[in-house]
Curated annotation (Swiss-Prot):
Protein name: Periviscerokinin-2
Modified residues (Valine amide): V9
Domain of life: Eukaryota
Organism field: Musca domestica (House fly)
Tissue: Dorsal ganglionic sheath of fused ventral nerve cord.
Length: 9
């Protein structure tokens, strides 16, 4: 997983 792979919700 990448560092900016988290969904921004």
């Amino acid at each position: 997983a990448s560092l900016f792979n988290a969904p921004r919700v």
